[in-house]
């Protein structure tokens, strides 16, 4: 199975799927903000940045999927982004499920001074909403719960792909070849 996953990771389609799915989710977030009028909070902005990290990881490996080092860089960036996104989503879910006056998120994103994304790209990274509000749901799950599911899937898939890259597998012996 690991050999199959390694072969699978050497195909451009896999990395295109990663880049396309994260771009589609980012586009959906922008539609929710500008099309439906839902206001993003600080944690939503951080989750968006994690999604953009997944997009960049997909683009890196899409350049040359047969290059081992590019695959490893893409997997490391993708796994870091998906784990970070999952942790932020868990924190966001805790704020929504267990609201309390002392549990609030900040109003201004805490980006490094050298990378003030909220000033460079305010149409994507400028938070205007509250983290405690649940504004949308689908099939009984809120947007944050969907993000927990999505980031969990990314973590599992990228972890399996990373394991397939580093663990040596025995070649299959064929009897009739």
Curated annotation (Swiss-Prot):
**Where is it found, in Gene Ontology cellular component terms?**
plasma membrane
Where are the Periplasmic topological domains? 32-49, 91-145
Residues on the membrane's Cytoplasmic side span: 1-14, 66-72, 165-177
* Single GO MF descriptor: electron transfer activity
Primary residence: membrane
Is rRNA-binding tagged as a keyword?
no
The record's Gene Ontology biological-process terms are: protein folding
Cell compartment(s), UniProt: Cell inner membrane
Q: List the disulfide bonds.
A: 41-44, 105-131
Asked if DNA repair is a keyword of the record, the answer is no
Q: In what way does this protein cross or attach to the membrane?
A: Multi-pass membrane protein
Q: Which Gene3D superfamilies match?
A: DsbB-like
User: Which keywords does this Swiss-Prot/TrEMBL entry list?
Assistant: Cell inner membrane, Cell membrane, Chaperone, Disulfide bond, Electron transport, Membrane, Oxidoreductase, Redox-active center, Transmembrane, Transmembrane helix, Transport
Bilayer-spanning residue ranges: 15-31, 50-65, 73-90, 146-164
Which PANTHER family does UniProt cross-reference here?
DISULFIDE BOND FORMATION PROTEIN B
Q: Describe the function of this protein.
A: Required for disulfide bond formation in some periplasmic proteins. Acts by oxidizing the DsbA protein.
Q: Which family does it belong to?
A: Belongs to the DsbB family.
Query: What is the name attached to this protein's record?
Result: Disulfide bond formation protein B
């Amino acid at each position: 199975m690991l050999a199959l996953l390694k072969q699978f990771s050497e195909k451009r389609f896999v990395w295109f799927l990663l880049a396309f799915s994260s771009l589609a989710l980012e586009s959906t977030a922008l539609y929710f903000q500008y099309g439906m009028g839902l206001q993003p909070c600080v944690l939503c902005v951080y989750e968006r940045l994690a999604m953009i990290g997944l997009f960049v990881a997909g683009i890196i490996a899409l350049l040359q999927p047969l290059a081992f080092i590019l695959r490893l860089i893409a997997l490391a960036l993708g796994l870091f982004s998906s784990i970070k996104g999952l942790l932020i989503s868990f924190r966001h879910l805790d704020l929504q499920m267990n609201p309390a006056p002392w549990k609030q998120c900040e109003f201004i994103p805490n980006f490094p001074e050298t990378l003030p994304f909220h000033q460079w790209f305010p149409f994507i990274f400028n938070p205007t909403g509250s983290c405690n509000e649940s504004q949308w749901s689908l099939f009984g799950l809120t947007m944050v719960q969907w993000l927990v599911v999505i980031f969990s899937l990314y973590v599992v898939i990228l972890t399996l792909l990373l394991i397939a890259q580093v663990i040596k597998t025995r070649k299959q012996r064929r009897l009739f070849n």
